[in-house]
Curated annotation (Swiss-Prot):
Protein family membership: Belongs to the FliE family.
Organism: Enterobacter sp. (strain 638)
Major localization class: other
InterPro entries, alphabetized: FliE
Protein name: Flagellar hook-basal body complex protein FliE
GO CC annotations on file: bacterial-type flagellum basal body
Keywords, alphabetical: Bacterial flagellum
Disulfide linkage: none
């Protein structure tokens, strides 16, 4: 019981020290940019499409160990990720148009 109390006091002291240095605890976390996250999501969509295309080419060339059900599953995953990306883009465009039509 006493240990938990001491840990609480220590964390409060650390928070006070951070405030004294004019930096908050939230400032120590890395910043995540919207553009970076969007770029990463587009890269993941591209990667799934490339992987599905490669898998389909391997199956077409008759490489051993490549099953039709795996190829179809990868192609569907690729299609679903692309459709999700398109829907996100549509929502972003709609939000942008709505913001632009607002009066200041």
């Amino acid at each position: 019981m006493a240990i938990q109390g001491i840990e609480g006091v220590i964390s409060q002291l650390q928070a006070t020290a951070m405030t004294a240095r004019n930096t908050s605890v939230a400032d120590t976390q890395p910043e995540i940019s919207f553009a970076g996250q969007l770029h990463a999501a587009l890269d993941r969509i591209s990667d799934t499409q490339n992987a599905a295309r490669t898998q389909a080419e391997k199956f077409t060339l008759g490489e051993p160990g490549v099953a039709l059900n795996d190829v179809m599953t990868d192609l569907q995953k690729s299609s679903v990720s692309l459709q999700m990306g398109i829907q996100v883009r549509n929502k972003l465009v709609t939000a942008y148009q709505e913001m632009m039509s607002m009066q200041v």
